[in-house]
C-alpha cells in the first residue's frame, strides 16, 4: 500500500499516534512515527533543521508516501514536502506558515521549554476530550522542547504551497492554535477540510474519537490516491 510517516508535536513523541497506528497498519500501510531527537549539542542547541534532517531519514526511498504532521509536526511536514513530495499530506491542528498566520507580536521562547514532569492537571486540561486512561498514559510521556525550534517556526519560516492532495484536520475547541487559523491554512493549501466539533488540540490523536478521526483520514487518503 505504501508508507505513512507521522511527525509529532512539540513536547510530544511518536506515541501520540498510538491510536492511529493500528488503523493504518490494518489497511496495509507501514506506519512510522518516531521521536524527534535533540541535536548532539543538546536540546537548547536544537534547530528546526535538525528535526527536518531526521524526518528525511525516516522516509524510505521508492515508496508511496503519506506524510502526516500534528501541530509543530504539521509545519515541519509542509517543509519536508518541498523536497520529498508525498502522494498525500495530512495536517492536524498544524502550526501555519508565517504568511498564513494572523499578525501578532512575536513570542520569545526560553532555550528549553519545560513540559516534562508537569502537573497531571495540565494534561487533564489539555486532553479534556480523552478518557482518564489515556490521560494517565500520556501524562508521563510529555518531554521538554527546544525553544529555538519554536522560535524559528513562529518567525519567518517560509514554505511552499503543497502540490499534492492535502487534508487539514481541525479541532473546533483547539485552545493552542485556534481553528480559524486552520481554516486559513486549508484555504492557502487548497486543502480538503475535516473540522470536529468540541475537539481539543490533541483530540484528533488522543480523544475518545481518535480512532474515528484516523479511520476518516484513512478513507480520505484511499479516495484521493485511487
Model-derived features: positions:
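Catalytic histidine-centered segment of alpha/beta-hydrolase-like enzymes
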Residues: 199-212
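Short beta-strand/loop motif that positions the catalytic acidic residue
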Residues: 162, 168-170, 174
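Active-site glycine-rich loops that stabilize anionic/oxyanionic intermediates
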Residues: 9-13, 71, 172-173
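Conserved alpha/beta-hydrolase
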Residues: 21-42
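Conserved alpha/beta-hydrolase "acid-adjacent" motif
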Residues: 175-181
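Active-site loop/oxyanion-hole signature of alpha/beta-hydrolase fold enzymes
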Residues: 36-65
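Flexible "cap/lid" loop of the alpha/beta hydrolase fold
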Residues: 82-116, 149-156
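Gly/Ala-rich beta-loop-alpha elbow adjacent to hydrolase catalytic centers
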Residues: 68-73, 77
Amino acid at each position: 500500500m505504501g508508507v505513512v510517516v507521522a511527525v509529532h508535536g512539540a513536547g510530544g513523541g511518536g506515541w501520540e499516534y498510538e491510536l492511529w497506528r493500528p488503523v493504518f497498519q490494518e489497511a496495509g500501510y507501514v506506519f512510522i512515527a518516531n521521536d524527534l531527537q535533540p541535536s548532539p549539542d543538546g536540546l537548547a542547541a536544537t534547530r528546526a533543521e535538525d528535526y527536518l534532517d531526521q524526518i528525511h531519514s525516516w522516509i524510505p526511498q521508492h515508496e508511496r508516501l503519506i506524510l502526516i504532521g500534528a501541530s509543530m509536526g504539521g509545519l515541519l511536514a509542509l517543509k519536508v514536502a518541498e523536497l520529498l513530495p508525498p502522494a498525500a499530506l495530512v495536517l492536524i491542528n498544524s502550526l501555519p506558515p508565517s504568511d498564513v498566520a494572523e499578525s501578532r507580536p512575536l513570542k520569545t521562547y526560553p532555550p528549553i521549554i519545560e513540559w516534562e514532569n508537569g502537573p497531571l492537571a495540565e494534561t487533564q486540561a489539555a486532553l479534556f476530550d480523552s478518557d482518564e486512561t489515556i490521560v494517565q498514559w500520556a501524562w508521563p510521556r510529555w518531554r521538554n522542547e527546544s525553544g529555538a525550534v519554536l522560535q524559528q517556526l513562529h518567525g519567518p519560516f517560509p514554505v511552499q504551497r503543497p502540490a499534492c492532495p492535502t487534508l487539514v484536520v481541525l479541532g473546533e475547541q483547539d485552545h493552542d492554535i485556534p481553528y480559524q487559523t486552520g481554516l486559513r491554512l486549508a484555504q492557502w493549501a487548497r486543502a480538503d477540510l475535516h473540522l470536529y466539533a468540541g475537539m481539543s488540540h490533541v483530540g484528533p490523536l488522543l480523544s475518545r474519537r481518535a480512532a474515528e478521526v484516523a479511520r476518516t483520514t484513512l478513507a480520505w487518503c484511499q479516495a484521493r490516491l485511487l
